[in-house]
């Protein structure tokens, strides 16, 4: 089972050119421009919180990276904080002094109050010099608030003890749990990668189960909407087929089966009951080849078609229009397939 873990660093895994679920989903959601743009979300509070919950539940050995923010001075607003964090990055990367010109350049980059005078922008940042120094002094840690830590602890405890989720963490004899499993495989002719939050292997019943952990700002009963919005179905289908390929190629596990894919969701505000969204395995093929939601007559593109389009855009270096537009040579027709009357 150890060989399921890639013999590479986390950075190497991130930098590989294999397609990830997030890149494929971003393309389907935002179009080809998403293939050449990368949003820096590393400093966003919801990203930090999600990572904290992941580490508490799945990788407690990483908790040394976190430190409670005990700064007692006046805290900057979120917009000024973004500028200050960028200033810290500049100092750490260059080792240079933070001049007024650098502050103005960062303010411009961050679209920080464009109508403010230059002197006002500089003063707004310099006002929090003590806070900037505090961040620099703790540069080796991910600073979090006491509230964030406490909520994360409660979420982890709920997941570990609630009846619907406990079974994936309080394992029985003959079961094994593997956290943060990184895989790179081929899928339908393309190289793909996936970071599996948790795999539970039952050697008695000869099964695998994939569990993915999600956190977010929406309430528990709204997660199903997030499932469609953020294309989590792509993740379920891709990861299922990736694991299927790996175990099919391993003599030790060739007679094991993969159970339904499971998402566990907890809102960042905490909840008494975890949201468990199960993707029945017989739906994976539909997600691959195209599918309808409910009684809608609109057919969504499947994973195979989406990856095919992504590969086309990379190969042809076209990112401003869709491959469908190029294949049609820019020509469209409104016919009976798009518009129907009552008697048609």
Where are these regions (language model features)?
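Non-catalytic protein-protein interaction segments used by genome-maintenance enzymes to assemble
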Residues: 174-176, 181-233
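Hydrophobic/aromatic-lined pockets within catalytic cores
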Residues: 57-62, 187, 200, 215-218, ...
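Secondary-structure boundary elements
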Residues: 169-175, 200-208, 244-257
């Amino acid at each position: 089972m150890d060989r399921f873990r890639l013999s590479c660093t986390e950075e190497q895994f991130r930098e590989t050119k294999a397609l990830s679920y997030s890149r494929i989903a971003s393309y389907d959601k935002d179009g080809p421009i998403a293939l050449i743009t990368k949003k820096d979300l590393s400093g966003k509070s919801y990203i930090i919180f999600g990572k904290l919950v992941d580490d508490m539940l799945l990788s407690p050995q990483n908790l040394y990276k976190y430190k409670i923010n005990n700064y007692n001075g006046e805290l900057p607003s979120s917009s000024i904080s973004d500028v200050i964090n960028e200033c810290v990055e500049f100092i750490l990367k260059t080792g240079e002094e933070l001049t007024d010109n650098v502050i103005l350049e960062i303010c411009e980059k961050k679209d920080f109050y464009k109508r403010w005078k230059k002197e006002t922008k500089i003063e707004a940042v310099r006002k929090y010099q003590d806070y900037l120094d505090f961040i620099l002094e703790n540069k080796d840690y991910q600073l979090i608030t006491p509230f964030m830590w406490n909520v994360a602890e409660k979420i982890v405890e709920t997941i570990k003890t609630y009846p619907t989720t406990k079974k994936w963490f309080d394992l029985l004899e003959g079961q094994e749990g593997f956290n943060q499993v990184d895989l790179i495989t081929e899928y339908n002719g393309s190289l793909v990668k996936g970071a599996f939050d948790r795999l539970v292997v039952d050697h008695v019943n000869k099964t695998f189960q994939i569990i993915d952990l999600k956190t977010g700002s929406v309430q528990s009963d709204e997660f199903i909407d997030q499932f469609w919005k953020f294309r989590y179905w792509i993740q379920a289908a891709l990861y299922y087929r990736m694991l299927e390929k790996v175990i099919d190629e391993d003599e030790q596990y060739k007679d094991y089966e993969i159970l339904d894919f499971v998402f566990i969701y907890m809102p960042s505000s905490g909840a008494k009951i975890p949201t468990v969204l199960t993707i029945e395995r017989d739906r994976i093929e539909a997600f691959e080849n195209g599918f309808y939601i409910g009684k809608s007559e609109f057919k969504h593109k499947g994973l195979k078609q989406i990856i095919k389009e992504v590969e086309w855009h990379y190969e042809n270096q076209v990112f401003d229009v869709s491959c469908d537009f190029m294949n049609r040579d820019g020509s469209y027709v409104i016919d009976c397939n798009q518009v129907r009357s009552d008697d048609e």
